[in-house]
């Protein structure tokens, strides 16, 4: 039997994506100024980034990066367990753990790497199982597959479904894993109920709060704190540094024994160069601002309310989200692509989310809000969406990249 040719396979898959009009294209950003982006020589108002608190270009954050780069250079030069673990890394781990009320923390290069590290290190036997919400982030789902343990999924937000899946896999060690805020819907997991399920089934409860920390809860401590939970109920939690904190990387906070086990055994941690100290210094400055500046969260609450009120007024179908992620359901791919193009023509950058990222028939505009947006910009966006809907409804639709 002839071995399959990889180039032929890739070519066939590419042709299929073209036929389905699902080719993905990177847009090149020339410059950025707050929520404004220069793309193809035009300045657009962006409602598509994860810079929820507006910290990525904040003066103190940028100054911290510049000062640390001048002192420590561009990179860590080694993994954490060789000579890449700088004072900046240690300080950031300590302050994030203290902020979130956890005894220990461990830095990773990204949330994807962190989720893989957690599951590979903790679910190491083939009978082990990870039970997950069906709409969890791809990094959580892929991590289970790569770890080699069993994956069981329950319907979105279905606490009884989580219980059934755990009861149906009693043989090995178990983890119950969920997003805190779901990145495509913007809704929040029922953490208190899920924590009880995990306790009853002797499963480790793990929360990926990439989109919650910095935005929700007291002092921006995220979904876990907002639900009145802590390390006793959620022994392990993921925090990404590239969303509300405006930087790059991730931190896993948790029980000391669990975090120590990750540091000593997790291959994605052991065999990866540490984050650049300058980037870590910038994130440390962002953490301190996120803890201090409650006005940023208050501004977000106002903007979220204004957007939802305006969208409802014009008859748009909203999802159950009180977070900065505000999806507008459009249904078909062709519709959402045409809407996104019309908004760009009007001066706004809004992400068009389509299958396979979301289910068939659930394509949507994913509006994301930042504390740097103004009420005027939000109202202008709503007016532009209304106009785009009117234009799109009058023309034949064809999906495009």
UniProtKB/Swiss-Prot annotation:
Gene3D superfamilies: Aspartate Aminotransferase, domain 1, Type I PLP-dependent aspartate aminotransferase-like (Major domain)
Protein name: 8-amino-7-oxononanoate synthase
Cofactors demanded by this protein: pyridoxal 5'-phosphate
Name of the top EC class for this enzyme: transferase
Species of origin: Xanthomonas axonopodis pv. citri (strain 306)
Modified residues (N6-(pyridoxal phosphate)lysine): 243
PANTHER family membership: 8-AMINO-7-OXONONANOATE SYNTHASE (PTHR13693:SF100), CLASS II AMINOTRANSFERASE/8-AMINO-7-OXONONANOATE SYNTHASE (PTHR13693)
Function: Catalyzes the decarboxylative condensation of pimeloyl-[acyl-carrier protein] and L-alanine to produce 8-amino-7-oxononanoate (AON), [acyl-carrier protein], and carbon dioxide.
Family stated for the protein in its record: Belongs to the class-II pyridoxal-phosphate-dependent aminotransferase family. BioF subfamily.
Subunit architecture: Homodimer.
Family annotation (InterPro entries): Aminotransferase_I/II_large, AON_synthase_class-II, AONS_Archaea/Proteobacteria, AONS_Proteobacteria, PyrdxlP-dep_Trfase, PyrdxlP-dep_Trfase_major, PyrdxlP-dep_Trfase_small
Cell wall biogenesis/degradation keyword on record: no
Top-level taxon: Bacteria
Signal peptide range: none
Keywords recorded for this protein, A-Z: Biotin biosynthesis, Pyridoxal phosphate, Transferase
């Amino acid at each position: 039997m002839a071995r399959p040719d990889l180039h032929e396979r890739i070519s066939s898959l590419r042709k299929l994506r073209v036929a389905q009009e699902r080719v993905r294209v990177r847009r090149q950003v020339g410059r950025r100024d707050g929520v404004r982006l220069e793309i193809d020589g035009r300045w657009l108002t962006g409602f598509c980034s994860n810079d929820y608190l507006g910290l990525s270009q904040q003066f103190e954050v940028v100054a911290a990066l510049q000062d640390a780069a001048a002192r420590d250079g561009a990179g860590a030069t080694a993994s954490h367990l060789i000579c890449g673990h700088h004072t900046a890394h240690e300080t950031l781990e300590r302050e994030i753990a203290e902020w979130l009320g956890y005894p220990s923390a461990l830095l990773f290069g990204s949330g994807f790497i962190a989720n893989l590290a957690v599951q590979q290190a903790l679910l190491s036997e083939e009978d082990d199982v990870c039970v997950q919400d069906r709409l969890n982030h791809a990094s959580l789902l892929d991590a289970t597959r790569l770890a080699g343990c069993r994956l069981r999924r329950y319907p979105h937000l279905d606490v009884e479904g989580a219980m059934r899946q755990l009861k149906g896999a009693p043989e090995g060690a178990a983890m119950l894993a969920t997003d805190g805020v779901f990145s495509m819907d913007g809704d929040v997991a029922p953490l208190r109920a899920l924590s009880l399920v995990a306790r009853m089934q002797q499963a480790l409860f793990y929360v990926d709060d990439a989109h919650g920390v910095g935005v929700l809860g007291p002092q921006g401590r995220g979904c876990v704190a907002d639900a009145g939970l802590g390390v006793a109920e959620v022994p392990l939690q993921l925090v990404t540094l590239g969303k509300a904190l405006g930087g790059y990387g991730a931190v896993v906070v948790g029980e000391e024994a669990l975090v120590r086990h990750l540091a000593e055994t997790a291959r994605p941690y052991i065999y990866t160069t540490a984050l650049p100290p300058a980037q870590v210094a910038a994130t440390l400055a962002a953490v301190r601002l996120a803890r201090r500046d409650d006005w940023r969260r208050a501004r977000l609450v106002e903007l979220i309310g204004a957007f939802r009120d305006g969208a409802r007024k014009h008859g748009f179908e909203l999802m159950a989200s009180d977070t900065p992620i505000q999806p507008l359901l459009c249904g078909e791919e062709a519709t959402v692509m045409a809407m996104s193009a019309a908004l760009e023509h009007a001066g706004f950058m809004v992400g068009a989310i389509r299958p396979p990222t979301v289910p068939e028939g659930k394509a949507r505009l994913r509006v994301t809000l930042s504390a740097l947006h103004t009420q005027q910009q939000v109202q202008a966006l709503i007016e532009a969406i209304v106009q785009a809907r009117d234009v799109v409804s009058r023309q034949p639709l064809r999906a495009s990249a």
